[in-house]
């Protein structure tokens, strides 16, 4: 999946087990969908907490933040509870959506099932930006915000 591509609609359970559909999430504005390798690990915690801490900034650009990993619902629930996340964490337990986005790993799949990648998706399901960085955790939220601000001011 790259900038300009159209994302196929999908539905996955969030950390409460509630089914969440992309098209419904997009009804409130753009979605910043960030794939992370594993809940409760240091890098993923840093990344997800940075998204949490920028809640006001994302609200200003009318964008929703949505985390996604291959972790089961119960692990997502614990992650969300411990870190007090105010956004959905989707459970892509089979890796179907990760494969659709081209971020599912092959050989490294056991340790890190998905590539740390963020997609900024507009309300028409078009990809506005793709942010890839395995090591710069803050870059994902920061660059997504920069993209959304540029579009709003443009």
UniProtKB/Swiss-Prot annotation:
Q: Where are the disulfide bridges?
A: 44-49
Tell me the active site.
44, 44 (cysteine sulfenic acid (-soh) intermediate)
Described purpose of this protein according to its UniProt entry: Thiol-specific peroxidase that catalyzes the reduction of hydrogen peroxide and organic hydroperoxides to water and alcohols, respectively. Plays a role in cell protection against oxidative stress by detoxifying peroxides and as sensor of hydrogen peroxide-mediated signaling events.
Is Methyltransferase included in the keywords of this UniProt record?
no
What is the protein name for this chain?
Answer: Putative peroxiredoxin Rv1608c
**For this UniProt entry, what's an example GO CC term?**
cytoplasm
Q: Identify which top EC class this enzyme belongs to.
A: oxidoreductase
What does the subunit comment say?
Answer: Monomer.
Any one Gene Ontology molecular-function term assigned to this protein's record = thioredoxin peroxidase activity
**EC number(s) from the headed UniProt entry:** 1.11.1.24
| Additional notes on this entry | The active site is a conserved redox-active cysteine residue, the peroxidatic cysteine (C(P)), which makes the nucleophilic attack on the peroxide substrate. The peroxide oxidizes the C(P)-SH to cysteine sulfenic acid (C(P)-SOH), which then reacts with another cysteine residue, the resolving cysteine (C(R)), to form a disulfide bridge. The disulfide is subsequently reduced by an appropriate electron donor to complete the catalytic cycle. In this atypical 2-Cys peroxiredoxin, C(R) is present in the same subunit to form an intramolecular disulfide.
Q: Which GO terms describe its biological process?
A: cell redox homeostasis; cellular response to oxidative stress
Q: Which UniProt keywords apply?
A: Antioxidant, Disulfide bond, Oxidoreductase, Peroxidase, Redox-active center
What Gene3D superfamilies does the record tag this protein with?
Glutaredoxin
**Pfam (any one):** AhpC-TSA
Q: Which reaction does it catalyse?
A: a hydroperoxide + [thioredoxin]-dithiol = an alcohol + [thioredoxin]-disulfide + H2O
Q: Which InterPro entries match?
A: AhpC/TSA, Peroxiredoxin_AhpC-typ, Peroxiredoxin_BCP/PrxQ, Thioredoxin-like_sf, Thioredoxin_domain
Q: What are the Thioredoxin domain coordinates in residue numbering?
A: 1-153
According to its UniProt record, which protein family does this protein belong to? Belongs to the peroxiredoxin family. BCP/PrxQ subfamily.
